[in-house]
């Protein structure tokens, strides 16, 4: 009588399977905000405030770029003032 034994062999993974993730990346910094403070001297063309949308409005002698950046049109002193319903505008006063 011939007896054949069946061997039950189970192989396990030698390396763990690696799943994918949807995290692990970040956007580059945009460096938004005030570049010149109230009372500071600004030359013509210098950036006063970088923003997304009109958080701060342009006043006298201040230009508004197409990305809503505020810049000085003339040499002078930067002046931030409140107006209307909790809004802020920035002007440049000639020195």
UniProtKB/Swiss-Prot annotation:
One of its GO terms (cellular component) is cytosolic large ribosomal subunit. One of its GO terms (molecular function) is structural constituent of ribosome. Keywords: Ribonucleoprotein, Ribosomal protein. The N-terminus is cleaved by ribosomal processing cysteine protease Prp. Residues 17-37 are annotated as: Disordered. GO terms for biological process: translation. The keyword Ribonucleoprotein applies. InterPro entries: Ribosomal_bL27 (IPR001684), Ribosomal_bL27_CS (IPR018261). The keyword Iron-sulfur does not apply. Gene3D superfamilies: 2.40.50.100. Residues 1-12 form a propeptide. It holds the Pfam family Ribosomal_L27. Belongs to the bacterial ribosomal protein bL27 family. This is Large ribosomal subunit protein bL27. It comes from Malacoplasma penetrans (strain HF-2).
């Amino acid at each position: 009588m011939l007896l054949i034994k069946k061997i039950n062999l189970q192989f396990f993974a030698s390396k763990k399977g690696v799943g994918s993730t949807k995290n692990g990346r970040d956007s580059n910094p945009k460096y938004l905000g005030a570049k010149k403070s109230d009372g500071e001297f600004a030359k013509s063309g210098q950036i006063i405030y970088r923003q997304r949308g009109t958080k701060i409005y342009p006043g006298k002698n201040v230009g508004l770029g197409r990305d809503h950046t505020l810049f000085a049109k003339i040499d002078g002193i930067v002046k931030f003032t409140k107006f209307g319903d909790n809004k802020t505008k920035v002007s440049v006063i000639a020195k």
